[in-house]
Amino acid sequence: MKTKSNLIIISIFLIDFFTKKWILNNYEIFDSIKIFPMIKITYIRNYGIALGLFQSYSNLIRILIIVISIFILLFIFYMKNLCKDLLSNLGYSIIIGGSFGNIFDRIFYGSVIDFIDIYIYKWHFPVFNFADISIFIGFLILIYNKKIFIVNT
């Protein structure tokens, strides 16, 4: 199970990495291109946390966000290693892969690269990326499996 979960983590990270690399190589900041009804590629940089909170804070706060993110990631690794069931392990692995992607961005780019822009009429989601989708799906799996931060004994 460990090899499969490592493969999931690495795959999620690489998909996230290469989609962001493609955005960096092909778009200018704030470029926005409609690709489907209700879906655009809009290249933005998120200097804050989820949903763009704390965007305008100092570099010290940004460093603190990285440190806190790493500690949360270590905790999720710990919880994953305590899990015995396949579905929970899958959920944690997907979360870890996505978390690595966003932490990588913060460390090497100084911000998270977001580009998936979904809107329905005037209702508009914050722009996000593949790592965010992965983290969300991982949490949905844990909630479905009723194992979020609960250890099987």
From Swiss-Prot:
Keywords: Aspartyl protease, Cell membrane, Hydrolase, Membrane, Protease, Transmembrane, Transmembrane helix. Its main location: membrane. It comes from the Bacteria. GO terms for biological process: proteolysis. InterPro entries: Peptidase_A8. The active site is at D114, D132. One of its GO terms (molecular function) is aspartic-type endopeptidase activity. Pfam families: Peptidase_A8 (PF01252). GO terms for cellular component: plasma membrane. The keyword Flavoprotein does not apply. The keyword Translocase does not apply. Its EC number is 3.4.23.36. It catalyses: Release of signal peptides from bacterial membrane prolipoproteins. Hydrolyzes -Xaa-Yaa-Zaa-|-(S,diacylglyceryl)Cys-, in which Xaa is hydrophobic (preferably Leu), and Yaa (Ala or Ser) and Zaa (Gly or Ala) have small, neutral side chains. NCBIfam families: lspA. Belongs to the peptidase A8 family. This protein specifically catalyzes the removal of signal peptides from prolipoproteins. This is Lipoprotein signal peptidase. It comes from Wigglesworthia glossinidia brevipalpis. The gene is lspA.
